[in-house]
């Protein structure tokens, strides 16, 4: 561990050798930053500026992209720490960066859950839950999610204070690691378990249940098969893959590690260190979700995909097409008023497609109406 300058303190313990882990994190997070920053910045631009029609699903996707972008913007600070092997910045920046990771992970879980629940309401209960599938309701839910994760960010920031250790003749600071046993026995384990219950287990249960019900409904012989519904299946499968690949391994390992560190489950020091080594790999999978989410937008949201394809067309053709689309949208909104009551199945088709007349009458919102 290298440091700029600090006085030697004999009461400070020697620094653990985290350099192999730091090198791994340096490589993986560099790739996540290189891919995640442009992808999420582009996704947020498409949702807020390019798309003129927002479905309920797009509101959730827009907020998910904002959460991912916030995390990728914090990665340069992490990379500096992993390159230097010590924390050279103010303590507050360590606390903020650690809290942002928690906000992104649990916020992503909840936003993915809201996308799945919206598809469940649209396909399984298109009429009974119709009143919940409005842009205003979606915006309020997203505001509630941001408020919730900000509330949890306060205690998360408090426990992420840098720890001090001794490297050769210098006292240095570590961030994101080396939490003391006293901290684990105190407020850290209850905080971790509460965050996992509300931010991971509840969304996971909702995603599994809603996906299962939607798949069961669409598999019935009398179910209407359409391209839109196939896209819904792809969207739900993608959300399940992200949960199983990114969030389940990390949160499961974190719970086990917390029980070991708090001494609620007896284990030897080598066994505990092995679990920590696994956790350091799983945390990289959790951070990689911000790269996978934009792929979900592209392959499941037709309006998003068409907008990206349109970026390569000449400006005049793009403007002409946009004007024609807006004229068609205005006509569709007028006709949808008379046909809305006779199309219950259309409630399942809100996946960012501007040409759907039902989605126009029920789920249209301006970019200024984003829940950010």
Swiss-Prot record:
Any one GO molecular-function label of the UniProt entry:
G protein-coupled receptor activity
Looking at the keywords, is Disulfide bond present?
Answer: yes
Gene3D superfamilies linked? Rhodopsin 7-helix transmembrane proteins (1.20.1070.10)
What topology in the membrane does the UniProt record assign?
Answer: Multi-pass membrane protein
**Which terms are listed as keywords in the entry?**
Cell membrane, Disulfide bond, G-protein coupled receptor, Glycoprotein, Membrane, Receptor, Transducer, Transmembrane, Transmembrane helix
Tell me the residue ranges located in the Extracellular compartment per UniProt: 1-26, 77-96, 158-187, 261-276
Positions of glycan attachment: 4, 9
Q: Name one Pfam family in it.
A: 7tm_1
Which regions span the lipid bilayer? 27-47, 56-76, 97-117, 137-157, 188-208, 240-260, 277-297
Protein's GO biological process: behavioral response to pain
Return the annotated region ranges for Disordered: 312-372
Subcellular location(s): the record lists:
Cell membrane
Q: What is its main location?
A: membrane
Q: List the disulfide bonds.
A: 94-175
Q: Which InterPro entries match?
A: GPCR_Rhodpsn, GPCR_Rhodpsn_7TM
Q: Could you tell me which residue ranges are on the Cytoplasmic side of the membrane?
A: 48-55, 118-136, 209-239, 298-372
Look up keyword Cytoplasm and say if it applies. Answer: no
Q: Where is the composition biased (Polar residues)?
A: 332-341, 357-372
Instruction: Describe tissue expression.
Output: Not expressed in frontal cortex, basal forebrain, caudate putamen, thalamus, or hippocampus.
The entry sums up its family as follows: Belongs to the G-protein coupled receptor 1 family.
Outline what the protein does.
Answer: Receptor for lysophosphatidic acid (LPA), a mediator of diverse cellular activities.
The name on file for this protein is Lysophosphatidic acid receptor 5
Upper lineage is:
Eukaryota, Metazoa, Chordata, Craniata, Vertebrata
Gene (name only): LPAR5
């Amino acid at each position: 561990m290298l440091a700029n300058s600090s006085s030697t303190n004999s009461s400070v313990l020697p620094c653990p050798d985290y350099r192999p882990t730091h090198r791994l994190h340096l490589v993986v997070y560099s790739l996540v930053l290189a891919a995640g920053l442009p992808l999420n910045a582009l996704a947020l631009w498409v949702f807020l500026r390019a798309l003129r029609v927002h479905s309920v699903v797009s509101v959730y996707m827009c907020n998910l992209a904002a959460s991912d972008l916030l995390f990728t913007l914090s990665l340069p600070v992490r990379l500096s720490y992993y390159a230097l092997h010590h924390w050279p910045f103010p303590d507050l920046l360590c606390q903020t960066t650690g809290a942002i990771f928690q906000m992104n992970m649990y916020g992503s879980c909840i936003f993915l859950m809201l996308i799945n629940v919206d598809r469940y309401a649209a396909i399984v209960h298109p009429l009974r839950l119709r009143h919940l599938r409005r842009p205003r309701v979606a915006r309020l839910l997203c505001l509630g999610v941001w408020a919730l994760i900000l509330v949890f960010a306060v205690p998360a920031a408090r426990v992420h204070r840098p720890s001090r250790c001794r490297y050769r003749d210098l006292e240095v600071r570590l961030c994101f690691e080396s939490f003391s046993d006293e901290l684990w026995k105190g407020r850290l384990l209850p905080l971790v378990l509460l965050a996992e219950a509300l931010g991971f287990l509840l969304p996971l249960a909702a995603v599994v249940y809603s996906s299962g019900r939607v798949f069961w409904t669409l598999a019935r012989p009398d179910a209407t098969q359409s391209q839109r519904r196939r896209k819904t299946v792809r969207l739900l499968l993608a959300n399940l893959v992200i949960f199983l690949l990114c969030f389940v391994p990390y949160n499961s390992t974190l719970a086990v590690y917390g029980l070991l560190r708090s001494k609620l489950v007896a284990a030897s020091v080598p066994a505990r260190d092995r679990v920590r080594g696994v956790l350091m790999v799983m945390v990289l999978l959790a951070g990689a979700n911000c790269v996978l989410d934009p792929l979900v937008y592209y392959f499941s949201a037709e309006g998003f995909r068409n907008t990206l394809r349109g970026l390569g067309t000449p400006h005049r053709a793009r403007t002409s097409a946009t004007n024609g689309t807006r004229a068609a949208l205005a006509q569709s909104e007028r006709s949808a008023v008379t046909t809305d009551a006779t199309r219950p199945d259309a409630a399942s088709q809100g996946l960012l497609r501007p040409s759907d007349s039902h989605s126009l009458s029920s789920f249209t919102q301006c970019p200024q109406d984003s829940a950010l």
